[in-house]
A protein has these predicted regions:
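Short alpha-helical segments that sit at the start of domains
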Residues: 1-13, 40-41, 59-61, 66
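Residue-level detector of family-conserved "landmark" positions at structurally sensitive sites
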Residues: 27, 39, 56-57
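Short amphipathic alpha-helical interaction segments
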Residues: 34-45
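A short, conserved structural fragment
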Residues: 47-57
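Short amphipathic alpha-helical interface segments
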Residues: 3-31
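Residue-level signal for short amphipathic helical patches enriched in basic/charged
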Residues: 20, 34, 49
Length: 66
């Protein structure tokens, strides 16, 4: 795993959120077709860049773009 690959996963994640709006972790995983660890790396990347809003609704983590 290298930085370029994580950047690609982050791009897939950003695109899914841009097209579909707020998604749960389960929905985001389905939309991106990423493995769980890949999705967490992508979310970390985008969160570090300040591009995500992460909240909890009914014990489910919800993610959207800022």
């Amino acid at each position: 795993m290298n930085v370029e690959i994580i950047g690609e996963w982050a791009g897939k994640t950003w695109t899914a959120l841009n097209e579909q709006g707020t998604l749960s972790m389960k929905g985001l995983k389905k939309a991106t077709k990423l493995k769980e660890k890949e999705l967490y790396a992508a979310i970390g990347w985008l969160a570090r860049e300040g591009k995500l809003n992460i909240s909890e609704a009914e014990e489910e983590i919800m993610i959207s773009l800022i």
